[in-house]
Design a protein with these regions (language model features):
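Active-site metal-binding motif and surrounding structural segment of the metallo-beta-lactamase
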Residues: 2-13
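Conserved phosphate-coordination/catalytic loops
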Residues: 29, 33, 60, 89, ...
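Metal-associated gating/positioning segment near the N- to mid-region
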Residues: 11-76
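Short, surface-exposed connector motifs at secondary-structure boundaries
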Residues: 46-51, 77-81, 186-194
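A glycine-rich helix N-cap at a beta->alpha junction
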Residues: 71-87
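Conserved short loop/turn motifs at secondary-structure junctions
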Residues: 54-59, 85-87, 116, 196-199
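Histidine/acidic residue-rich metal-binding segments in metalloenzymes
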Residues: 93-214
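Hydrophobic faces of well-ordered beta-strands that scaffold small-molecule active sites
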Residues: 16-22, 50-52, 81-85, 106-110, ...
Length: 214
């Protein structure tokens, strides 16, 4: 067996990074990037495992579309890979079918506030059904849609051009906290594994505690 020895004198060796939230562009926008090109870039930067979000074109709303991503990655990804199942107000049955792949699929992604296309679940009954029925991890984009729309209406009523500076005013602390609070409460109620992505505010940290010794 051939063994390659690499001289690491003066270098720093760290484990490969796991990136749990990447946004690749395949399918639908492959003129921008593909699973191959993004995985290649990831490895180049020290990321050896990735978990990709469902907001491609079309979004990963069905098991067939999700399986197509896995098939592409099997042939072209240069890193370890997994993909999130997408959710909407109309695909509960498909979402719960992810339970059959719980050893392979990293989780179910829920946009509790609108962000991209129709990747949104703001129906409270449907949210509870997903949290209750999911045997895989649920990853959430937490913004309270009702409060967000109310804030947006106030700003657009002023008939001015919105800028980046308005973003934290429209998607403010209450918008974030109320949604994260709801997600945590549902996870506790149903014993669901929950990962709240990209926490925005310090207030939201009050919802979490780490009781495990480090």
């Amino acid at each position: 067996m051939r063994i390659e020895e690499i001289d690491g004198t003066g270098q720093t060796l760290i484990p490969g990074v796991i990136d749990d939230q990447v946004h690749f562009r395949e399918p639908g926008l492959t003129h921008k990037a593909t699973i191959y090109t993004e995985a290649k870039a990831a490895v180049r930067g020290g990321v050896t495992s990735f978990m990709e979000m469902p907001n491609t074109n079309p979004p990963a709303f069905t098991q067939d579309l999700l399986e197509q991503k896995y098939d592409t990655a099997k042939h072209h990804a240069l890193a370890n890979y997994s993909f999130f199942m997408g959710t909407s107000n109309d695909n509960l049955e498909e979402v719960l079918r992810t339970n059959d792949k719980k050893n392979d699929v990293c989780g179910v992604k829920i946009f509790m506030g609108s962000s991209t296309g129709n990747l949104l679940v703001d129906n409270p009954i449907l949210l509870e059904k997903i949290f209750e029925g999911s045997e895989v991890l649920i990853a959430t984009h937490c913004e309270e849609e009702r409060l967000f729309k109310s804030n947006l209406a106030k700003f657009t009523a002023e008939n001015r051009v919105l800028t980046a500076a308005d973003h934290p005013l429209i998607r403010d602390e209450d918008v974030c906290f109320e949604s994260s609070f709801r997600a945590v409460q549902m996870a506790k109620k149903f014993g669901t594994r929950l990962h709240v992505l990209h926490i925005t505010t310090a207030k939201e940290l009050q919802l979490f505690s780490n009781m495990l010794p480090l």
